[in-house]
Amino acid sequence: MQIIDNKALLLKLRNPKQVTTVIPKSKAVSDHEVLVNWGVQETHTLRGLNIKVPSPIEGRYVWTGKFAPMSHQRTTSSFLTMHQKAFCFNEAGTGKTASAIWAADFLMKQGIIKRALVICPISIMDSAWRADLFSFAMHRTVDIAYGPAAKRKKIIAGKPDFLIINYDGVEIVKDDIAAAGYDLIIVDEASHYKNAQSKRWKVLNSLVKPETWLWLMTGTPAAQGPEDAFGLAKLVNPAGVPKFFNAWKDMVMYKVSQYRWKPKEHSERTVHRALQPAIRFTKEECLDLPDMTYVKRDVALTKQQELYYNRLKNQMVMEVAGAQITAVNAAVMMGKLLQISAGASYTESGDTVQFDINNRYSVLKEVIAESTHKVLIFVPFKHVIDMLTAQLTKDGITNAMIRGDVSAGDRTEIFKQFQTQPDPKVLVIQPQAAAHGVTLTAANTVVWWAPTSSLETYAQANARVHRKGQANKCTVVQLQGSGVERRVYKMLDEKIDVHAKVVDLYKELLD
């Protein structure tokens, strides 16, 4: 095969007619050579004839954006353009969002699709998808359909190139989405569609037509067991699974007792065949990926948190009117705002005001589910640690906890067990209690439940996983829900000492 001027493919074939009879933009140039237009539709047809040719994105696309694609991202984008319905199982932190954006942009430029619908968790609608679209496809129009139904409908009617919406928001405006003509649907963290009996799954399935492009993305397919693959396969590769779930379950599981099932010996192969076509890169396979990747997840404050947060902020505005702001006062008030954001605030009398943490906890569970190894969670406040570990235990997520009041002997035992045993899966740590000297390379994901105000503590805490003995690429996830959290994380990212700039930061918050 030869590529001619990035426009055509010169193929050597025993029988050129097998191509010229089905591809209008092709012609035989000799008894065994055929020239074919190098387009998306022609390439799909050639692949259907078992003639392996590269995607035209490889030669005909100017890769847009602030950053050049890494090798695995180019390969992923190429794969997606060659499959109308497909899975992308690249691990979290490998940049699959950008790969999907480039692939979609290329298809738009080729006139194959008009616009794309992105369905994802609320926590990454803005911080991941909109941010990445602005970074990699800034020439495209982007909007987020979130809020009351009337607002969502108005946004959809505007027909942006990329429309971002949360899972359960799709049902509210499904008719509007169908009418708007979104011919590519990208589902991020697609494991939320594993249950083919759920209303969420049925709504999505009603939007997927034979001509619809559909890419399902998740780093952890069938994470809870082989039966989870059924709903995903029914969307992308329905011919690869039986019509009914129970028949699929019998294929991949066997009954141990009345309420217990176990995977069959060759269930992984069965799942692999069903979840096709698919591409997967682990972080370790991405040789040009940075050793440490940082991502942000947005978390909405609850109404209770917003009430207390705004009340305290207004009080701060009144107190500083005409007064000199000291670093001590600024640090104290900022600390209280961070406490409210995290889930528990301490009063002057030493009592604790506890807030609803369900929004933040739901996002944390998503991160844990996506992680292929163990997880460290850094939580600056003691009472929040108690709340969090209680909830993890209730949900069956094995965990251990390190706070300042845990003895040195107990810490050593907890660290040893975390490093050498299958459980606990999660270690919840107060940053000041274990930021230095400890090796915790059994984990490759670090979650900051809330930011620390110490640049040194932040760097040292992240270094617990990113150090000698770590065999995997690592991801740091920052959970953020309030203005003060976003500003503190931004300063930490830019390696600015928060303590040195605390007064300036305080003034910013009050503006």
Predicted regions: what is each one?
Residues 123, 144-152, 167-172, 194-197, ...:
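Conserved helicase motor
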Residues 54-89:
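Conserved pre-motif I regulatory segment
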Residues 124-148, 236-239:
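Conserved helix-turn-beta segment of the N-terminal RecA-like "Helicase ATP-binding" lobe
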Residues 113, 130, 158, 184, ...:
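Conserved P-loop NTPase motor "coupling/switch" region that bridges the ATPase
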Residues 93, 99, 104-120, 289-313, ...:
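Conserved Helicase C-terminal RecA-like lobe
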Residues 78-82, 97-112, 203-205, 236:
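Walker A/P-loop NTP-binding motif
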Residues 453-511:
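A conserved SF2-helicase RecA2
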Residues 170-175, 224-226, 385-389, 411-415, ...:
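SF2 helicase motor core recognition
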